[in-house]
């Protein structure tokens, strides 16, 4: 979730990284492997560790197109009822919060089997 200005800035940096030649998954891994809060400095350090210029990111993060991208993402999240991370969408179900991998896999398998993340006799047709 976006909790502070520093969190907004980290999201802006993530947008810029996603638009760069850097592998976004590498950025994500570096960012969430760091200790402490995900904030401006953590995002800048993660991007810089992948070869992006800290100065360029700081100069570009306030650009109107970055603000527009952030607003679009926020609008979509609001429309889907997402207020935090992580949130999973499986089928038409919104599942907030972290899930153990086994639970996530089971819910996906259930969706494939019965059309719901939790199968019941009626969901399975009998």
Please give the residue ranges for each predicted region.
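C-terminal cap of thioredoxin/glutaredoxin-like
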Residues: 44-126
């Amino acid at each position: 979730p976006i909790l502070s200005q520093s969190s907004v800035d980290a999201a802006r940096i993530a947008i810029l990284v996603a638009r760069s030649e850097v592998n976004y998954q590498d950025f994500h891994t570096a960012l969430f492997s760091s200790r402490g809060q995900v904030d401006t400095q953590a995002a800048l350090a993660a991007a810089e560790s992948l070869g992006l210029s800290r100065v360029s990111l700081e100069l570009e993060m306030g650009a109107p197109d970055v603000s527009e991208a952030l607003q679009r993402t926020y609008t979509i999240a609001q429309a889907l009822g997402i207020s935090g991370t992580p949130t999973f969408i499986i089928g038409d179900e919104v599942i907030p919060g972290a899930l153990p991998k086994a639970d996530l896999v089971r819910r996906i398998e259930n969706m494939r089997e019965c059309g719901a993340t939790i199968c019941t006799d009626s969901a399975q047709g009998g």
